[in-house]
Amino acid sequence: MMEKHGGKVTSDRRAGRRQHGQRCSASDAAPLVVVVILIVGALFLILGPTGSSSFTVPRIRVVFNEPVHVAVAAPPPPPPPAQMQAGANASSEEDSGLPPPRQLTDPPYSLGRTILGYDARRSAWLAAHPEFPARVAPAGRPRVLVVTGSAPARCPDPDGDHLLLRAFKNKVDYCRIHGLDVFYNTAFLDAEMSGFWAKLPLLRMLMVAHPEAELIWWVDSDAVFTDMLFEIPWERYAVHNLVLHGWEAKVFDEKSWIGVNTGSFLIRNCQWSLDLLDAWAPMGPRGPVRDRYGELFAEELSGRPPFEADDQSALIYLLVTQRQRWGDKVFIESSYDLNGFWEGIVDRYEELRRAGRDDGRWPFVTHFVGCKPCRRYADSYPAERCRRGMERAFNFADDQILKLYGFAHESLNTTAVRRVRNETGEPLDAGDEELGRLLHPTFRAARPT
């Protein structure tokens, strides 16, 4: 019984092996057929069909190490000779939407229609508007409009806009304490007068628009007031129309291109000044005109390199070559720093503060010439050196304001502040005449009736 059963089991197992072998043979044959089909198909595509079949397949040809020839468009024909120089000088400006620069063969540039009889018309306007006097309290000083500004676009360096903001805050502080009006410009009023020259059309426009302003005070954006208590000796310039920081000997004897500086100057609102602007401006249009005058200034002014014309060199050139016309009305100031060069100043602030004001020689204006705070790099000095110097100048000036309210910076190298005076409940200016004069200047007091 067991053998019978065992024989049946053995027979069943053999039958199972035969069936499994048949299945394996069938499954092994299937991949082989697929491989053969793929090989034949590939050969068919590569070698192409034979016979007279109308069906054609593109032939594939692989080539190595054969040079590739790319067709290059023919260059455009060269421009006419008269346009070549203009195109070379104007490409960057035209890309930014500006008109082509003025050429040497074009009519000279002008700020606009010549203004005649301005003094008489301004006097008539002032007489008709007594509520806007050209002289104001205290002591009947001239009404002054402080003018500054920066480019309309944001600075390439993100820190630049912050530095410009702090520089403007510094100017607002000084103007508020001394009762001066302030105008901040961020527009190019004339596309031809870019860079340093942008101030000329602006000054002319403000003179005509504000006849009540007796003096216009231009201050560069990178110039910082660093003696907030200093009052300009206005009466010293009563018979002069232009006040510049510099040295007469350097201008008229040496003909030095740095004999004066136009980073901070006063100009009177009168016919003489309008005529000066008209004589000054034709040397400033961007392009070949500015380049040509730059070469002329390099020949006529001592020590000047032959770069494009700048407004400072142009003004010195006018004073030197037309001294009889302009010289008598120009005051060149050297008794205080109307425009002090920053490099010899910024590291001495602590020393000056310890010495106090007894000698009266605190730098009035610290001008960061060559730093260009709006750019990622400086013209002549390491950017970090410039930024550190500006930080110290801002804080030195700001301490003089914060002191009015009982605070001061922890050091000139940081913006952190600390309290320096305990509050007593009395007015802040009690017992401090100088503090009271700044907190409550006389020009803000009501006039007696």
From Swiss-Prot:
Localization per record: Golgi apparatus membrane
Chief location of this protein within or outside the cell: Golgi
Lumenal topological intervals: 50-449
Q: Where is this region: Disordered?
A: 1-24, 74-109
Q: Does the keyword Transmembrane helix apply?
A: yes
Q: How does it sit in the membrane?
A: Single-pass type II membrane protein
Q: What does the record list as coiled-coil region(s)?
A: none
Q: Which GO terms describe its biological process?
A: xyloglucan biosynthetic process
Plastid is among the record's keywords: no
- Give me the glycosylation sites of this protein: 89, 413, 422
Which residue stretches does the UniProt record annotate as biased composition, category Basic and acidic residues? 1-14
Matches recorded under InterPro entries: Glyco_trans_34, Nucleotide-diphossugar_trans
Give me the segments passing through the membrane: 29-49
Enzyme Commission number(s) of this protein: 2.4.-.-
Cytoplasmic compartment: which residues?
A: 1-28
| Keyword annotations of the record | Glycoprotein, Glycosyltransferase, Golgi apparatus, Membrane, Signal-anchor, Transferase, Transmembrane, Transmembrane helix
Give GO terms: molecular function aspect only: hexosyltransferase activity; UDP-xylosyltransferase activity; xyloglucan 6-xylosyltransferase activity
CC per GO annotation:
endosome; Golgi membrane; trans-Golgi network
Q: Which Gene3D superfamilies match?
A: Spore Coat Polysaccharide Biosynthesis Protein SpsA, Chain A
Family assignment from sequence similarity? Belongs to the glycosyltransferase 34 family.
Annotated function: Probable glycosyltransferase that may be involved in the biosynthesis of xyloglucan.
This one is known as Probable glycosyltransferase 5
| Source organism | Oryza sativa subsp. indica
* Taxonomic placement: Eukaryota, Viridiplantae, Streptophyta, Embryophyta, Tracheophyta
